[in-house]
Amino acid sequence: LHTAYRRQRQMCIRDRYMEGDEFSVETMSVDGVCHVIQVTDKLTSGAPYFVEMGHTQPSMFAEDIKMRISEVAKAGIKALGINHGPSHTEIKLTSTGPKIVEIGARLGGGCITTHLVPLSTGVNMVEANIRIALGETPDLCKKYDKGAAIRFLQPLPGIFKSVEGVDEARGISGVIEVGFMKKIGEVIPELSNGLDRVGYVITQGNTREEAVRLCGQAVKKIKFEMV
């Protein structure tokens, strides 16, 4: 332990700054075979914190680009020796091709695998993960090809006094869920990480474009009062 701490003080790892559109690849590995379930487009707050503010499935990019992104993810998963279970691989599409940001041997957060994947493909990755852990064969066959999206809600910083329009947003056909991570009376700081996000809207459409449009309609209905 002493040696490890000394090494930390004497060196650092420097990563190349990557510019380009951001994606995540949702995969499930079974007996060494990596199955790509979905490719997700990511929307962030931009510099300096790049907080994830939305996800959309399927990706809007052409099939050949999605294939390249998927192959890079699969190569990274293979290199790490992940043979069983889920992986969530974040990728940037740079001017020199897809580059891996990170690989997590886990299901994707931000409602990606709990909500968006089943809404866009019909594949229940949570159930599949449990079945793999039990030594059973998971069902990874896509049932349909629809659009799904989530957009996070973020008012200006201040004290969260009230919110209106939630019932109207929930009443829009195609809106699956409107939820909140913060309670009335909480202090909402300036957005710097995912824990600062206040709420979210999840939608499903026959296409990704429809899902995005429905998200936009629902978000416009929701009005925050901050003091």
Task: Name each model-derived stretch.
Residues 1-13:
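Single conserved hydrophobic/aromatic residue that forms the stacking wall/gate
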Residues 5, 49-50, 109, 191-196:
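Short, flexible turn/loop "capping" segments at secondary-structure junctions
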Residues 15, 22-43, 47-52, 72, ...:
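Beta-strand scaffold of nucleotide-dependent catalytic cores
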Residues 17-20, 81-83, 193:
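A short catalytic or substrate-binding loop motif that flags glycine-/basic-rich loops and adjacent residues
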Residues 51-59:
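Bateman (tandem CBS) regulatory domains
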Residues 64-89, 95, 104-164:
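Active-site "cap" helix and flanking loop/linker of ATP-utilizing ligase/carboxylase catalytic domains
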Residues 93-99, 192-196:
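A short, glycine/Asx- and small/polar-enriched loop/turn
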Residues 128-227:
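Peripheral (often C-terminal) accessory segments that flank ATP-dependent C-N-forming ligase machineries
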